[in-house]
Protein backbone atom coordinates (compact mmCIF):
# COMPACT_ATOMS: atom_id res chain seq x y z
CA UNK A 1 0.00 0.00 0.00
CA UNK A 2 1.00 3.66 -0.07
CA UNK A 3 2.16 3.61 3.56
CA UNK A 4 4.59 0.77 2.83
CA UNK A 5 5.85 2.43 -0.35
CA UNK A 6 6.43 5.72 1.52
CA UNK A 7 8.35 3.93 4.26
CA UNK A 8 10.55 2.10 1.74
CA UNK A 9 11.34 5.40 0.06
CA UNK A 10 12.11 7.05 3.44
CA UNK A 11 14.85 4.48 4.13
CA UNK A 12 16.35 4.77 0.66
CA UNK A 13 14.77 1.71 -0.93
CA UNK A 14 12.95 1.65 -4.23
CA UNK A 15 9.53 0.08 -3.70
CA UNK A 16 9.36 -0.73 -7.39
CA UNK A 17 6.06 -1.49 -9.01
CA UNK A 18 4.30 -3.02 -6.02
CA UNK A 19 0.90 -2.58 -7.66
CA UNK A 20 1.53 -5.85 -9.50
CA UNK A 21 1.88 -7.83 -6.27
CA UNK A 22 -1.43 -9.65 -5.98
CA UNK A 23 -2.83 -13.13 -6.23
CA UNK A 24 -3.39 -14.68 -9.63
CA UNK A 25 -7.04 -14.26 -10.69
CA UNK A 26 -7.49 -18.03 -10.78
CA UNK A 27 -5.89 -18.61 -7.36
CA UNK A 28 -8.07 -20.70 -5.08
CA UNK A 29 -8.56 -18.96 -1.74
CA UNK A 30 -9.96 -20.70 1.29
CA UNK A 31 -11.53 -17.48 2.58
CA UNK A 32 -11.40 -13.78 1.79
CA UNK A 33 -11.75 -11.18 4.58
CA UNK A 34 -11.63 -7.40 4.63
CA UNK A 35 -11.12 -5.72 8.01
CA UNK A 36 -11.36 -2.12 9.13
CA UNK A 37 -8.23 -2.09 11.29
CA UNK A 38 -9.35 1.10 13.04
CA UNK A 39 -12.40 -0.75 14.38
CA UNK A 40 -10.42 -3.65 15.87
CA UNK A 41 -9.94 -3.83 19.63
CA UNK A 42 -6.30 -4.04 20.80
CA UNK A 43 -5.18 -7.67 20.97
CA UNK A 44 -2.98 -9.65 23.33
CA UNK A 45 -1.69 -13.20 22.92
CA UNK A 46 -1.62 -15.34 26.05
CA UNK A 47 1.28 -17.66 26.83
CA UNK A 48 2.64 -19.79 25.15
CA UNK A 49 1.67 -19.12 21.53
CA UNK A 50 0.95 -16.13 19.30
CA UNK A 51 -2.13 -18.09 18.22
CA UNK A 52 -3.65 -17.44 21.67
CA UNK A 53 -4.77 -13.96 20.59
CA UNK A 54 -7.84 -12.28 22.02
CA UNK A 55 -9.11 -8.75 22.59
CA UNK A 56 -7.33 -7.09 25.51
CA UNK A 57 -10.72 -6.58 27.16
CA UNK A 58 -11.13 -10.37 27.35
CA UNK A 59 -7.73 -10.88 28.99
CA UNK A 60 -7.51 -11.12 32.76
CA UNK A 61 -5.93 -8.12 34.51
CA UNK A 62 -2.78 -10.19 35.01
CA UNK A 63 -0.04 -8.47 37.03
CA UNK A 64 3.18 -8.02 35.02
CA UNK A 65 6.72 -8.06 36.37
CA UNK A 66 8.37 -6.97 33.12
CA UNK A 67 7.08 -4.83 30.27
CA UNK A 68 9.34 -5.13 27.23
CA UNK A 69 9.23 -2.83 24.21
CA UNK A 70 11.82 -4.33 21.94
CA UNK A 71 12.83 -6.47 19.01
CA UNK A 72 12.75 -5.88 15.30
CA UNK A 73 8.97 -6.34 15.27
CA UNK A 74 7.90 -4.04 18.08
CA UNK A 75 10.43 -1.27 18.67
CA UNK A 76 10.77 0.57 15.38
CA UNK A 77 10.67 4.38 15.41
CA UNK A 78 6.87 4.55 15.03
CA UNK A 79 6.45 1.93 17.77
CA UNK A 80 8.67 3.93 20.13
CA UNK A 81 6.78 7.13 19.33
CA UNK A 82 3.41 5.51 20.05
CA UNK A 83 4.54 3.91 23.30
CA UNK A 84 6.04 7.23 24.43
CA UNK A 85 2.70 8.96 23.82
CA UNK A 86 1.20 6.70 26.50
CA UNK A 87 4.16 7.10 28.89
CA UNK A 88 4.65 10.88 28.59
CA UNK A 89 4.36 12.40 32.07
CA UNK A 90 3.69 9.03 33.69
CA UNK A 91 5.78 6.46 35.55
CA UNK A 92 5.88 2.70 35.61
CA UNK A 93 4.02 0.92 38.38
CA UNK A 94 5.88 -0.18 41.48
CA UNK A 95 7.06 -3.74 40.93
CA UNK A 96 6.97 -3.54 37.12
CA UNK A 97 10.20 -3.08 35.20
CA UNK A 98 9.99 -1.45 31.78
CA UNK A 99 12.79 -2.34 29.38
CA UNK A 100 13.16 -0.73 25.96
CA UNK A 101 15.45 -2.08 23.22
CA UNK A 102 15.01 -0.02 20.02
CA UNK A 103 15.04 -2.12 16.86
CA UNK A 104 17.98 -0.30 15.28
CA UNK A 105 20.54 2.36 16.00
CA UNK A 106 18.90 4.56 13.36
CA UNK A 107 15.52 4.34 15.12
CA UNK A 108 17.10 4.94 18.53
CA UNK A 109 19.02 7.99 17.30
CA UNK A 110 15.92 9.47 15.68
CA UNK A 111 13.88 8.82 18.82
CA UNK A 112 16.61 10.39 20.96
CA UNK A 113 16.78 13.46 18.70
CA UNK A 114 13.03 13.93 19.12
CA UNK A 115 13.04 13.48 22.92
CA UNK A 116 11.29 10.11 22.80
CA UNK A 117 14.08 8.21 24.58
CA UNK A 118 13.99 10.82 27.37
CA UNK A 119 10.27 10.11 27.85
CA UNK A 120 11.12 6.43 28.38
CA UNK A 121 13.88 7.29 30.84
CA UNK A 122 11.64 9.71 32.76
CA UNK A 123 8.99 6.99 32.99
CA UNK A 124 11.52 4.70 34.67
CA UNK A 125 12.49 2.56 31.68
CA UNK A 126 15.84 0.87 31.36
CA UNK A 127 17.25 1.27 27.85
CA UNK A 128 18.86 -1.87 26.43
CA UNK A 129 21.16 -2.26 23.41
CA UNK A 130 19.84 -2.80 19.89
CA UNK A 131 20.12 -6.57 19.83
CA UNK A 132 18.10 -9.77 19.94
CA UNK A 133 18.88 -10.10 23.66
CA UNK A 134 15.85 -10.80 25.82
CA UNK A 135 13.61 -11.53 22.80
CA UNK A 136 15.69 -14.62 22.07
CA UNK A 137 16.44 -15.39 25.73
CA UNK A 138 20.06 -14.16 25.61
CA UNK A 139 22.07 -12.20 28.13
CA UNK A 140 21.62 -10.95 31.65
CA UNK A 141 18.14 -9.54 31.02
CA UNK A 142 16.51 -12.85 30.08
CA UNK A 143 13.39 -13.61 32.08
CA UNK A 144 13.86 -15.37 35.40
CA UNK A 145 11.80 -18.06 37.07
CA UNK A 146 8.05 -17.40 37.29
CA UNK A 147 8.30 -13.92 35.75
CA UNK A 148 5.27 -12.59 33.89
CA UNK A 149 6.15 -10.34 30.96
CA UNK A 150 4.15 -8.38 28.42
CA UNK A 151 6.20 -7.92 25.27
CA UNK A 152 6.03 -6.26 21.86
CA UNK A 153 7.98 -9.15 20.33
CA UNK A 154 6.54 -11.66 17.85
CA UNK A 155 6.91 -14.94 19.74
CA UNK A 156 6.00 -16.12 23.24
CA UNK A 157 6.81 -19.81 23.17
CA UNK A 158 7.64 -21.45 26.50
CA UNK A 159 11.19 -20.57 27.52
CA UNK A 160 11.91 -18.38 24.48
CA UNK A 161 12.64 -15.24 26.51
CA UNK A 162 14.26 -17.00 29.45
CA UNK A 163 13.15 -19.45 32.11
CA UNK A 164 10.63 -22.11 31.07
CA UNK A 165 8.48 -21.09 34.05
CA UNK A 166 8.14 -17.51 32.77
CA UNK A 167 4.92 -16.39 31.08
CA UNK A 168 5.01 -14.01 28.11
CA UNK A 169 2.00 -12.13 26.79
CA UNK A 170 2.35 -10.50 23.36
CA UNK A 171 0.91 -7.07 22.67
CA UNK A 172 1.39 -3.84 20.76
CA UNK A 173 3.85 -1.23 22.06
CA UNK A 174 0.78 0.84 23.09
CA UNK A 175 -0.53 -2.02 25.23
CA UNK A 176 2.91 -2.78 26.68
CA UNK A 177 3.33 0.89 27.70
CA UNK A 178 -0.14 1.00 29.27
CA UNK A 179 0.55 -2.23 31.14
CA UNK A 180 3.86 -0.86 32.47
CA UNK A 181 1.96 2.08 33.98
CA UNK A 182 -0.87 -0.05 35.36
CA UNK A 183 1.34 -2.90 36.57
CA UNK A 184 -1.10 -5.33 34.94
CA UNK A 185 -2.31 -6.15 31.45
CA UNK A 186 -4.17 -2.98 30.49
CA UNK A 187 -6.14 -1.59 27.57
CA UNK A 188 -4.10 1.27 26.08
CA UNK A 189 -7.27 3.18 25.26
CA UNK A 190 -7.59 3.88 29.01
CA UNK A 191 -4.37 5.90 28.76
CA UNK A 192 -4.72 7.71 25.42
CA UNK A 193 -5.03 11.47 25.71
CA UNK A 194 -6.33 14.05 23.26
CA UNK A 195 -3.84 14.35 20.41
CA UNK A 196 -2.33 10.88 20.89
CA UNK A 197 -2.19 8.64 17.84
CA UNK A 198 -4.70 5.82 17.91
Which residues does each PLM region occupy?
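Fe-S-dependent hydro-lyases/dehydratases of central metabolism
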Residues: 1-198
